[in-house]
Amino acid sequence: NIQGQGECAIFRKFGHRGLFSVGGPIEANGRLCYIDNCTTTVLSPAARLGDPCLNLLVFPENVKQTLHIHPSLRYGIVVAGRGVCVNPSTGELPLRPGMTFCLEETYPHCFNSDKEGLVIVAYHPDSDMGPTDQQNPMLNRTYTRF
């Protein structure tokens, strides 16, 4: 029984059994470079190649992001700041803290942040990174010939 005054968004890939993990707090800047001077951090990595992952996206103030697509859908929640998600066909979707959204696969879009910048946590249902049975930290750093 969950009680309280807060709100929750659950993004789930049916059939996937994820690992329990606790992350945070969200940092002011991402640890990796992203397009148009934005940054990103992998908050919850894929346990295996192809598994879902959770990422932080940080947009500095007044960013006009390059129009782009993703090969799979994206779920997002606006953590802080304000801006818009732009699609050439449907126009602008205003973004504000606490708002959740879904971008369908191959949906052309870009984010534009305002003077506050914009912070988004994005769920990716798949990943092109992650360990495999042939490539993983345990196996890669085990030497049977020494």
Kindly label every feature range from the protein language model.
Residues 1-6, 45-51, 63-75, 107-116:
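Short, low-complexity cationic-aromatic patches
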Residues 56-60, 68-85, 124:
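Short, conserved beta-strand element in jelly-roll/cupin
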Residues 29-66:
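A short glycine-rich, His/Asp/Glu-containing loop-to-beta-strand
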Residues 65, 84-86, 129-131:
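Short loop/beta submotifs within extracellular cysteine-rich repeat domains
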Residues 7-38, 112-146:
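Double-stranded beta-helix
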Residues 1-4, 87-107:
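Short acidic-glycine-tyrosine-enriched beta hairpin
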Residues 55, 65, 74, 90-91, ...:
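Short, conserved secondary-structure segments in the cores of folded domains
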Residues 41, 73, 83, 101, ...:
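Glycine-centered loop/turn positions within well-structured domains
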